[in-house]
Amino acid sequence: MGKLTYLRPHRGDIKPVLLLLTSHRLDCFLICTRCLERYTDLDRLKHIYVVANALGSEHQALAKRFVARHHNATLVERGPRGLVPAVLAAQNEILAAHMDDVIIKLDEDLFVTPHWLEHLIDGYCDHAERPDVPLVMPLVPISPPGRHVLNRFLRISYPSERAMYGGPPIEENWVYHRWMWEKLLHENLAEVYLHDLQPKYGYVGYLTINCVIFDQRIMRLVLPFPTNRVAGQTTSDEKAFNLALSSCKMKVAVLGRSIAHHYSFSKCEDYLRSHVSIDEVWRYMQGASAHPAATRQCRVPSGPSELTLLRAGG
């Protein structure tokens, strides 16, 4: 009898389930879905769930139109407003039904760029057989993991502006929010960063969950998400993921050659909107560029188990 050989499926055979959460940022949701449609072959996705949390009438109409345009999309409407219990309960139901699938979770204020899906699947493939790296995310400049991966680039490119990208945690650092968006919009920071051959991955022990790909390796550790307060404190899917990462000593792979853009954390949103208009962000996103992803093969685990160069110093 001839030797049996396991054939790894091509990465094109992987059809992730997309879980898109939206609640109150109507203009961000509009840009998010426009970028998805502009930069993604949505037929590559097994299914798209738009989890709509207590939307206003105009927002609801936009969500319904987006779903109607795509045969593989479903609108899941839940209330009242808030992660607990509505959104986490909806995620529990969806993820439990797709335990054997590859999942991409996306927030309404995250804007994808060309080849984002190919890069994300490629990163997933590189780590699919590593139990210690169950999550992969793009480089998101306005996020703690993204800021960590950008650290060396920022120090070399902007040595005289360290006060702009240092300081408080990113989630409440309005100076960094504004500074980063101005560099992206006016000095081609993303293009310059990608122009140099960056390390393919950076690794961190935590994540922000606005854009991430994962499978049952982490789902079996975090599901079901709590739908009540824990010890009197509010909870979230992000807290559940980070607790599992910490307790199991696991890492998140951050793509070094694929950037996606997060508009803002909630504490900085009002300030940022007064200085960086969402219309300007949309104009920028229409011209977004990225490196193409390489073609490769991947096995999905089964069962439990030169543009304008930055001036030195800005």
Q: Predicted regions span which residues?
A:
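N-proximal low-complexity "stem/linker" segments adjacent to membrane-targeting elements
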Residues: 1-35
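C-terminal catalytic/acceptor-binding lobe
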Residues: 31, 186-314
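Short, acidic, metal-binding catalytic loop of nucleotide-sugar glycosyltransferases
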Residues: 34-45
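A conserved acidic beta->alpha catalytic loop
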Residues: 50-63
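A short, glycine-/small-residue-rich helix N-cap motif at loop->alpha-helix starts
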Residues: 78-88
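Active-site nucleotide-sugar/metal-binding loop of Leloir-type enzymes
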Residues: 88-102
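Short beta-strand-to-loop acidic/aromatic patch adjacent to the donor-nucleotide binding site
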Residues: 99-111
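Conserved catalytic core of nucleotide-sugar-dependent glycosyltransferases
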Residues: 119-216, 220-222
